[in-house]
């Protein structure tokens, strides 16, 4: 579960290393975001020659959470940390590579590009 002020690692090659959630999109009273939800993030740590700079604001989709996701068969998939992939204004991934596994829950019409770039889909 991701909420405002949560820091996430970045799972793509945009140049950002760490981002902070500044808003969970989808309703004024919405507090938490799970895997597959879109959030507004601020870049807190970036590599010197990356595509993004520290302090910039982007949309991002949550791809891994420490809380995990429960499947229909009762299984629970948890990760060591929280991670997101940065998106542009058209909600397309900015990076050209995805690092680490992503879950099948991202296999919607909107995020098929992320699933196809990911090295492993759980």
Swiss-Prot record:
The answer on whether this UniProt entry bears the keyword Cytoplasm reads no
What keywords would UniProt list here?
Ribonucleoprotein, Ribosomal protein, RNA-binding, rRNA-binding
Its Gene Ontology molecular function terms? Answer: large ribosomal subunit rRNA binding; structural constituent of ribosome
Protein name in the entry? Large ribosomal subunit protein uL14
Enumerate the CDD domains for this protein.
Ribosomal_uL14 (cd00337)
Kindly indicate whether the keyword Acetylation belongs to this entry.
Answer: no
Might you name a Gene Ontology BP term for this protein? translation
Q: Which HAMAP family match?
A: Ribosomal_uL14
State any GO CC term: cytosolic large ribosomal subunit
InterPro entries in the cross-refs? Ribosomal_uL14 (IPR000218), Ribosomal_uL14_bac-type (IPR005745), Ribosomal_uL14_CS (IPR019972), Ribosomal_uL14_sf (IPR036853)
Q: What does the protein in this record do?
A: Binds to 23S rRNA. Forms part of two intersubunit bridges in the 70S ribosome.
Write down the Pfam families for this protein, in alphabetical order: Ribosomal_L14 (PF00238)
Family of this protein: Belongs to the universal ribosomal protein uL14 family.
Per UniProt, subunit arrangement is:
Part of the 50S ribosomal subunit. Forms a cluster with proteins L3 and L19. In the 70S ribosome, L14 and L19 interact and together make contacts with the 16S rRNA in bridges B5 and B8.
**PANTHER family per the UniProt record, alphabetical:** 50S/60S RIBOSOMAL PROTEIN L14/L23, LARGE RIBOSOMAL SUBUNIT PROTEIN UL14M
